[in-house]
């Protein structure tokens, strides 16, 4: 009986997740190109971090690189979301 309840809960969660993603896509459709939006987000993030870390020593300055992926590698962290066509990716930044 517990197994059946657990399976039903997992099935409910699995069905609910794609519905939420489809709802978010419908709400955030603005007509702008998605790749440009991701590039603007990455540029704004890098500019904000550069302003926060105004360091004169070149050895202490970091170069931040961001890319849109389905998952982030070790040493990267999720800094936002990217939208390319109908897919939602993670904005993974290293630096």
UniProtKB/Swiss-Prot annotation:
- Quote the subcellular location field of this record: Secreted
In terms of InterPro entries, this protein maps to:
Alpha-defensin (IPR016327), Alpha-defensin_C (IPR006081)
Which GO biological-process labels does this protein carry?
A: antibacterial humoral response; antimicrobial humoral immune response mediated by antimicrobial peptide; cellular response to lipopolysaccharide; defense response to Gram-negative bacterium; defense response to Gram-positive bacterium; disruption of plasma membrane integrity in another organism; innate immune response in mucosa
The tissues in which it is expressed are:
Highly expressed in spleen, and expressed at lower levels in intestin and lung.
Q: TM segments? A: none
UniProt keyword annotations, A-Z? Antibiotic, Antimicrobial, Defensin, Disulfide bond, Secreted, Signal
Report the SS bond pairs: 66-93, 68-82, 72-92
**Record's GO cellular component terms:** extracellular space
Family designation: Belongs to the alpha-defensin family.
Its function, per the record, reads:
Has antimicrobial activity.
Q: What is this protein called?
A: Defensin-A3
Q: Which organism is it from?
A: Ornithorhynchus anatinus
